[in-house]
């Protein structure tokens, strides 16, 4: 990477926050100020995701030849400059994506508008998690001729019987697998702090998502004076499954499905400050989510 790559990325952020947003309405409700606030928050906050584009150029300049790119598909922001860079600098290559998450009805980024697929950066082939998702992703607007039914490559480690993970884990415990959203993390941690007073014997482990703002998370933990925990960032999520007694989640993560598949006690918690992106919402899963600290306490009991 060169200095010019970083300067161009900063310029991209500056252009992003200067895109005019006016007269954005939901029926008669003006949402322009809300969209502007999000625009200012995101303009420079996600610049690191753009660096993959010039990185691909540097790889091309260095003489690399790449026939195929493989990546985990969630239709998130970092995937767009990645696909654009692949097609720009390695036009003869194929981009193959494998589905890495569930599809949530309330997460608009997982759906394409009418004819949006004609210009939206999309992989050449998307390996779906089974035949059901052929219809799910097709109905979400993705080109049906690019969808292929296949195995869920994320779950291959579910069949592993052994692990080299040897961290000394305190028991009994609860694990909080945080997602990409700081607000969801704050809601979960604040409720768990209250609940932990009722169960002092349960040790708390927090697993941070790589897209979280760690500095802001640390500030929140200090603000609420929550310090009796350890981070569970070491090892894979599958490593922690065999060392965890209870998992608590505010949604927005396929870890919920993995937890159920492994037979680990799971408590789904509806957040008070965001949408509840629950991958089990469309299933007949018999245990309903909870919301308040009192409900969580009853669920733990």
Regions found by a protein language model. Give the residues of each.
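Catalytic binding pocket for nucleotide-activated donors in carbohydrate/polymer assembly enzymes
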Residues: 138-149, 224, 246, 251-301
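Active-site-proximal region of nucleotide-activated glycan assembly enzymes
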Residues: 1-2, 40-47, 51-54, 61-149, ...
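Short acidic alpha-helix that forms the nucleotide-activated donor recognition element
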Residues: 234-244, 261
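Structural motif
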Residues: 1, 67-68, 71-75, 125, 129-131, 173, 177-181, 203, ...
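Conserved N-terminal ligand/cofactor-binding loop architecture of enzyme catalytic domains
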Residues: 1-53
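Conserved catalytic-core segment of nucleotide-activated headgroup transferases in glycan assembly
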Residues: 139, 148-222, 230-231, 290
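A short acidic (Asp/Glu
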Residues: 77-85, 106-111, 136-140, 159-161, ...
């Amino acid at each position: 990477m060169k200095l010019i790559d970083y300067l161009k990325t900063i310029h991209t952020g500056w252009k992003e926050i200067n895109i005019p947003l006016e007269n954005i309405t939901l029926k008669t409700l003006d949402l322009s100020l809300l969209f502007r606030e999000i625009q200012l928050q995101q303009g420079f906050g996600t610049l690191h995701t753009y660096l993959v584009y010039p990185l691909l150029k540097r790889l091309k300049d260095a003489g690399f030849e790449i026939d195929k790119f493989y990546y985990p598909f969630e239709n998130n922001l970092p995937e767009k400059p990645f696909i654009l860079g692949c097609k720009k600098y390695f036009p003869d290559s194929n981009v193959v994506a494998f589905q890495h998450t569930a599809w949530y009805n309330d997460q608009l980024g997982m759906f394409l508008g009418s004819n949006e697929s004609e210009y939206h950066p999309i992989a050449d082939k998307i390996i779906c998690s089974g035949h059901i998702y052929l219809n799910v992703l097709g109905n979400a607007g993705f080109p049906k001729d690019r969808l292929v039914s296949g195995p869920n490559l994320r779950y291959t480690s579910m069949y592993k019987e052994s692990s080299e993970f040897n961290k000394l884990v305190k028991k009994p415990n609860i694990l909080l697998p945080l997602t990409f959203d700081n607000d969801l993390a704050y809601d979960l941690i604040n409720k768990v702090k209250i609940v932990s007073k009722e169960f002092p014997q349960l040790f708390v482990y927090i697993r941070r998502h790589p897209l979280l703002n760690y500095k802001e998370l640390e500030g929140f933990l200090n603000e609420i004076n929550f310090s009796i925990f350890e981070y569970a960032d070491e090892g894979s999520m599958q490593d922690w499954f065999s060392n965890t007694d209870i998992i608590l989640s505010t949604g927005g993560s396929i870890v919920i499905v993995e937890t159920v598949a492994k037979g680990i006690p799971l408590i789904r918690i509806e957040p008070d400050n965001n949408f509840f992106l629950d991958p089990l919402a469309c299933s007949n899963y018999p245990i309903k989510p909870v919301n308040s600290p009192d409900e969580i306490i009853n669920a733990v009991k």
